[in-house]
Amino acid sequence: MAPSRLQLGLRAAYSGISSVAGFSIFLVWTVVYRQPGTAAMGGLAGVLALWVLVTHVMYMQDYWRTWLKGLRGFFFVGVLFSAVSIAAFCTFLVLAITRHQSLTDPTSYYLSSVWSFISFKWAFLLSLYAHRYRADFADISILSDF
């Protein structure tokens, strides 16, 4: 079932705000805290949120109808970055535990693992929406063939 315009607008707004937050995390943790792990995962979360925003905007503009292979590519990119984010989450969590880092330290690997999980969330949402929109347009294209 196709989402309403309100749902699409809310999804797009949430994606846009989250992409700005991810890029802000990238800048702050690169310049101020000099913690590349958190900066990288925050930047990845921002890029993935921006990609989800592009997915929603292209769905609203009806661009996907003629380019279903693009949605398939977005799905596989989401799956790839889901795996990368889970691996980064586990790695940062193990590093934080073995180095006995504080939970409240802004330069600890615990914060990097949190942003790895947020990156996983956006990668998962990219795959989910690409799959749903592709199924939605595949049904429409089957009906339009008759």
Swiss-Prot record:
Membrane topology category: Multi-pass membrane protein
GO MF annotations in UniProt: heme binding; heme transmembrane transporter activity
Primary location group: membrane
Gene Ontology CC annotation, any one: lysosomal membrane
Transmembrane segments: 12-32, 40-60, 74-94, 110-130
Domain of life: Eukaryota
Coiled coil regions in record: none
Effect seen on changing residue 73 to S: No effect on heme transport
A GO BP entry: heme export
Location relative to the cell: Endosome membrane; Lysosome membrane; Cytoplasmic vesicle, Phagosome membrane
Result after altering residue 82 to L: No effect on heme transport
Chain span(s) of sequence motif Di-leucine motif: 142-143
Induction: Induced by iron via heme and non-iron metalloporphyrins in macrophages as well as by erythrophagocytosis (at protein level). Also induced by hemolysis.
Effect of mutating residue 115 to C: Slightly decreases heme transport
Tissues expressing the protein: Highly expressed in the brain, kidney, heart and skeletal muscle. Moderately expressed in the liver, lung, placenta and small intestine. Strongly expressed in macrophages of the reticuloendothelial system.
Keyword set, alphabetical order: Cytoplasmic vesicle, Endosome, Lysosome, Membrane, Transmembrane, Transmembrane helix, Transport
UniProt KW Transmembrane keyword: yes
Chemical reaction(s) catalysed: heme b(in) = heme b(out)
UniProt function note: Heme transporter that regulates intracellular heme availability through the endosomal or lysosomal compartment. In macrophages of the reticuloendothelial system, is the heme transporter for heme-iron recycling. Essential for macrophage iron homeostasis, transports heme from the phagolysosome to the cytoplasm during erythrophagocytosis (EP).
PANTHER family from the UniProt entry: HEME TRANSPORTER HRG1
Family of the protein in this entry: Belongs to the HRG family.
Protein name, per record: Heme transporter HRG1
Gene name of this polypeptide: SLC48A1
